[in-house]
A protein has these predicted regions:
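Short, basic phosphate-binding NTP loop
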Residues: 1-81, 90-101, 123
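Phosphate-binding loop of NTP-binding sites
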Residues: 56, 62-198
Length: 199
């Protein structure tokens, strides 16, 4: 599935129709113009073979996040959330190295730990995955709480709290409040697996 996401320097909608041509099973787009181009192409097409499905929505990013949340809610996988100012990726890799020797384990690829990376990580989890390690980063207040609302971690690990990205947070207190949201999420999950770890 190709999600046509927008960024500061790109617009995935520009590649949506190309993705279908190259075999994508589906495209999710929030561009009226691209949807109209798709419909026009479908009308003109004389091929009997159908291409992938085009989903037109109000916001492609929100659709990605909602789909990830839906997928997470269907999983029985134990989700371990990791946050902190530094050391998230190293901690994730160390934990993955240990757990994957005994369990079918999935982990965030690289440091894809934001509002796009966390949903992509969740969507990569298969039904037979026993443990998933989800890295969660933040550069502004409220971001960890939002990521937790999607990932619903059973366990939380906080590596440390420093002053990196303080320009987005404005104060150390805001950083602490934001990072603490991981623990609040785990505590409020009422999961029988709930555990919290602080470095």
């Amino acid at each position: 599935v190709f999600f046509a996401l927008r960024g500061e320097n790109f617009d995935g909608n520009n590649f949506a129709l190309k993705a279908l041509e190259q075999g994508a099973a589906a495209v999710v787009s929030d561009s009226v113009q691209v949807f109209e181009q798709y419909m026009e192409t479908e009308r003109r097409s004389v091929e009997t073979k159908r291409r992938g499905i085009f989903f037109f929505c109000r916001d492609s990013l929100q659709m990605l996040q909602e789909l990830a949340k839906y997928h997470r809610n269907r999983l029985k996988t134990t989700i371990i959330g990791i946050s902190g100012t530094n050391g998230k990726t190293t901690t994730k890799e160390l934990i993955y190295s240990v757990l994957s020797s005994a369990f079918k384990t999935r982990a965030t690829a690289g440091n894809l730990n934001n509002h796009i990376g966390v949903p992509l990580t969740l969507l990569s989890i298969t039904a037979d995955t026993e443990v998933a390690i989800v890295e969660m980063g933040a550069n502004h207040p409220g971001e960890i709480a939002f990521l937790c609302s999607i990932a619903r971690p059973d366990m939380g690990i906080l590596t440390n709290i420093g002053t990196a990205h303080i320009e987005g947070f404005k104060s150390r207190e805001n950083i602490i409040t934001t990072k603490k949201a991981l623990f609040e999420s785990v505590k409020n999950s009422h999961s029988s697996k709930a555990h919290l770890f602080v470095n």
